[in-house]
Amino acid sequence: MKEKYELIFKDFYNYLLFDKNYSLNTINSYLTDMYDLLMFIDKSSNQEITLHNLSENDIRDYIKDLSKHNMSERSISRKISAFKTYYKFLIIINKIKNNPMEFIIIPKQNKTLPTVLSIEEVLTLLDIPLNTPGDYRNKAMLELMYATGLRISELINLKMSNIDLELNLVKTIGKGSKERIIPVGDYATEYLKEYIYNYRPSFIRKNNSEYLFLNRSGNKMSRQMFFKIIQKLALEKNIKTKFSPHTLRHSFATHMLEYGADLRTIQELLGHSNISTTQIYTHLSTDKLRENYDNFHSNA
């Protein structure tokens, strides 16, 4: 069924990629959102409804349906954003005259602070018994992620050519196809060298993949597989803090700030285009400061 709509969204895909300069993750999310909307239309009793004549009320009905099925506000907001972008695109290419999304507002969300591990929890998580090639690969991935603050998508898309083991640097392409170069500490670099020279060869198959971190089939590791590895380790280590795919990235930024790094440096390391995105970590550090004050100040 999904293949049926690939041609419909081909031009939209190109618009997001080349005109809007969106990341592939964002593009895939938007296309999935549009596909879900099409499924809703297909199930409609009104066979006259199409993407091009969908009304504002039709979309509002769909949004209500999502809420009834307990979809989170964040997910609904992203879908609305996808629909707005799509119908703006249809206006630009003169496919429609009236925009059904014009008066539909993206609901404001309460900013939730990202989950962060304590330094002790990070050290516990990274203390991996090294018995198999997979253990050495996982150790190198986790050490590199915590040492650099890379996003999971950036980590798994690293190629051998992106690593400079002599200068201790990693080059990555982040959101908006922006390139950045990040220093890597000696400790993480040693585990990278160990993996690359001694254990990565055991993952190489006939395809001889150029990606740095490989699965047992010799292909690039998926986001899902890497996150499962982290979750499994956290469970084994009895780490109670709730995990998200970016927990190590958030922990990297927060610990950098706590140890005196300035906000602008952290912004550059994380690849944030706007420093306001980075400022959320100041709230985390303030919360930690308050906790320590309450625990240790005699008059707190």
Residue positions per predicted region:
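Conserved catalytic core of the tyrosine transesterase superfamily
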Residues: 1-300
